Amino acid sequence: MVNFTVDQIRSIMDKKANIRNMSVIAHVDHGKSTLTDSLVCKAGIIASARAGETRFTDTRKDEQERCITIKSTAISLFYELSENDLAFIKQSKDGCGFLINLIDSPGHVDFSSEVTAALRVTDGALVVVDCVSGVCVQTETVLRQAIAERIRPVLMMNKMDRALLELQLEPEALYQTFQRIVENVNVIISTYGEGESGPMGNIMIDPVLGTVGFGSGLHGWAFTLKQFAEMYVAKFAAKGEGQLAPSERCKKVEDMMKKLWGDRYFDPSNGKFSKSAVNADGKKLPRTFCQLILDPIFKVFDAIMNFKKEETAKLIEKLDIKLDSEDKDKEGKQLLKSVMRRWLPAGEALLQMITIHLPSPVTAQKYRCELLYEGPPDDEAAMGVKNCDPKGPLMMYISKMVPTTDKGRFYAFGRVFSGVVSTGLKVRIMGPNFTPGKKEDLYIKPIQRTILMMGRYVEPIEDVPCGNIVGLVGVDQYLVKTGTISTFEHAHNMRVMKFSVSPVVRVAVEAKNPADLPKLVEGLKRLAKSDPMVQCIIEESGEHIIAGAGELHLEICLKDLEEDHACIPIKKSDPVVSYRETVSEESSQMCLSKSPNKHNRLFMKARPFPDGLAEDIDKGDVSARQELKTRARYLAEKYEWDVTEARKIWCFGPDGSGPNILTDVTKGVQYLNEIKDSVVAGFQWATKEGVLCEENLRGVRFDVHDVTLHADAIHRGGGQIIPTARRVLYACVLTAQPRLMEPIYLVEIQCPEQVVGGIYGVLNRKRGHVFEESQVAGTPMFVVKAYLPVNESFGFTADLRSNTGGQAFPQCVFDHWQILPGDPFDNTTRPSQVVAETRKRKGLKEGVSALDNFLDKL
């Protein structure tokens, strides 16, 4: 099976210019795992006959049954480029052998946290797009994440066999389809990228440069313009020139590639290229891409699928394809597969595209360092990362935990950015909450073993230098999900990953047999480790809650919990949605609360955020770590805040970074700074557990208007101020028309035209509304985009399929929070039911506490 040993891989690991770390990303069901197979079989790990069917990287049993990828899987490939191909590489290189660390990631939106983890440890991405359905919502989400992490994309148009056999497109129509997809992808890149002047330079994709592949993963064939340009250069050169040197040949091929795409036409009568669509005699000329590339492919398809024996034999001879004796007896689709696979092997084309156009760690870490490392940009660790220096201090990021075969232990999976990691090395293991100079979230322990990940297998290895992806044994006890591993004493953390979805659906679980409770608790701990997104919470009422990104995500998590992590039967509640609390107007009166000893008074008001500010805080455009003046200017310009107030933001909350703000608008108050910490603590408490039903607050700005304090410090300690601050904040919320917010999914549904009506019916029943409907050009498919409350999304997929005869495919992504209309204090409305249910579930007393409990008289 594997035709190279660990020692060989280890020797290449030192040639960091010849390493490529890349992930395969795409919309669900666009054929990532199938395509990955062609790469794996080229690099000699699957027998080539089974490629396209094995989906080697779907390692779990449920992945094979459901035919979807759930966890991202890593695999190392070895590929040698010929002298001729080496000439195309524009960055530094070292010999002709390349080590490609490939991560196949899931496309389903519920698992997009897995994608984030995969992106963090790679430098390049192969974006797969189904050429029939085009660029979908998930393609955009994933691509946006990749660009935010400064990862260079190359594009692969998959499923060309469908375009030819099912849709029977004409060559010109097919060219237009490709052209449109390339444009769509470039629009996304230019919207979220940093432009040509940015540190990465131009990352737009362009078939002319060879950064776009075309082909079919299922049939195992693919090409970029480079393959065809080479054929034609060889053909034209045969007419009288001898062997060319690799660099000259490279120039010729690159010139040829420019002629094979875009508005270039070919005149068969004299064999010349022209820029106009008609020749001198006024005859219409075919486009070069159609004539020189698609036409031969169409001919092969046509001859074989229509069983034209003589023509097929002629073509095979002309294309110089050598078939085995067993292949010669095949016909129809089987013969087509063998012929196309011999003529344009997918592995070759893709591996060449990857090695030539994706960056090596040496190239990539120069511009990724500032995004990855939180510390100062010139300390030892940062320099080590920037230069990818094996002699620098060890800096390694753990992006996720991978369960081992024996229950309960995990490999830590991550990438070495600087230094060398080796078995038995004593390292500093820093969790996400570690701050330099403090002891919390820091362990100093030896690494037990380092291992190589090979899809379904692991191989032990002595040590691994920087630029490589590796698994560690024995670190799992000290990290929950992610973290940084270093040998440098003053190292800061690598920056935490930003997830594009948030866990909004929760389920309560309990053991069927109460005696199994300890096992359940242990199982929940392991579950929290194994999935980057999942949150396991224990409520005050003693319930165990699991929060996930969506229905499917939770289903998989519960299955894992039951079968792998806790190994006990489990009872689960119906899924519940997390809500947020907010206010809709400014407080109707100035709120005052007195401290328990009656010596201190706080006066405050609450008001809602202007539209868009909460989202800016979520995205990190406005944050607690920003420089004061920059932030104040941003708030003043974009949201028309008063600059002096914007400079006096005390803090964000909950957790110091959430979408609520505490500002100080007082004028000349004595002792104010002494109680600042206590008020901030009260604010964090109040925003984490709101007054309506103890959910987080969102989008509320609290202003401290006035404070009267006791002159004696002993009478204004934390015990006096913190509870007072919380009471006054609650009073502010209650006087400012409090409202509930619910999470909303953006649903994208692909379906044929005739079932669009059925979709509207289902959405209307579930409080959804359609805001965009478009036809995918060149196909009979429609795309409907709608907003759907997460609360209504349970069973939505099944409902939709039954109403459309199984022809509609929905894809839900968490999009935004929206206010639930209605007053939570009016017993007839929806929000009041939600408040009552949530309070009951959390074991709080019935009914929201009255305003008098929080408000004091002067």
Curated annotation (Swiss-Prot):
Reaction(s) the record says it catalyses: GTP + H2O = GDP + phosphate + H(+)
What Enzyme Commission number does this protein have?
Answer: 3.6.5.-
* PROSITE patterns given in the database record: G_TR_1, G_TR_2
Recorded hits in SUPFAM superfamilies, A to Z, give:
EF-G C-terminal domain-like, P-loop containing nucleoside triphosphate hydrolases, Ribosomal protein S5 domain 2-like, Translation proteins
Task: Report residues binding GTP.
Answer: 26-33, 158-161, 216-218
State the source organism's domain of life. Eukaryota
Please give an example of a GO cellular component term from this record: nucleus
Quick one: a GO biological-process term for this protein?
Answer: translational elongation
Which compartment or compartments is the protein found in?
Cytoplasm; Nucleus
The UniProt entry, under CDD domains, shows: aeEF2_snRNP_like_IV (cd01681), eEF2_snRNP_like_C (cd04096), EF2 (cd01885), EF2_snRNP_III (cd16261), EF2_snRNP_like_II (cd03700)
The record ties this protein, via InterPro entries, to:
EFG_II, EFG_III/V, EFG_V-like, EFTu-like_2, G_TR_CS, P-loop_NTPase, Ribosomal_Su5_D2-typ_SF, Ribsml_uS5_D2-typ_fold_subgr
Which parts of the chain are coiled coil? none
| Limits of the tr-type G domain | 17-362
The Swiss-Prot or TrEMBL record describes its family as follows:
Belongs to the TRAFAC class translation factor GTPase superfamily. Classic translation factor GTPase family. EF-G/EF-2 subfamily.
Q: What is this protein called?
A: Elongation factor 2
Q: Which organism is it from?
A: Xenopus laevis
